Regions:
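Cleavable N-terminal targeting peptides that direct proteins into the secretory/outer-membrane pathway or into
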Residues: 1-21
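Periplasm-facing N-terminal accessory domains of Gram-negative outer-membrane beta-barrel systems
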Residues: 18-108
């Protein structure tokens, strides 16, 4: 019984240690009005991870490996915003807010 308990403890703590990364959180608003923007995609370039802002414009990206990253927003009708040199540390939450401006998208005639 003790052997099984030890093995479970090692597996549990081992997976926590190896899975730990940092977090990125923030809020996305419309620049002119200051209103939150729901559904904005925030991507960590080169990592294949990201999140969408919620109904309050808030987002959180978890399990980000430590390092320096570029974040990019994507939302129809709004200009893309890029933030470079965002530092993420293990066990810490890096804060980054975005203010998006509307962009006219012209279609073909």
């Amino acid at each position: 019984m003790n052997t099984i308990l030890r093995m479970l403890t090692i597996l549990l703590f081992g997976s926590i240690i190896f899975a730990e990364g940092g977090k990125i959180s923030g809020i996305v608003v419309e620049k002119d009005s200051g209103e939150p923007l729901p559904g904005v995609s925030i991507l960590v370039e080169g990592e294949g991870i990201g999140a969408d802002s919620d109904v309050n414009g808030q987002f959180i990206i978890i399990n980000v490996p430590p390092g320096t990253f570029t974040l990019k927003t994507s939302y129809i009708g709004y200009a893309t915003v890029k933030v470079t040199d965002l530092i993420v540390n293990i066990g810490r939450t890096s804060k980054q807010d975005f203010a998006l401006t509307q962009e006219v998208i012209e279609g073909e005639t």
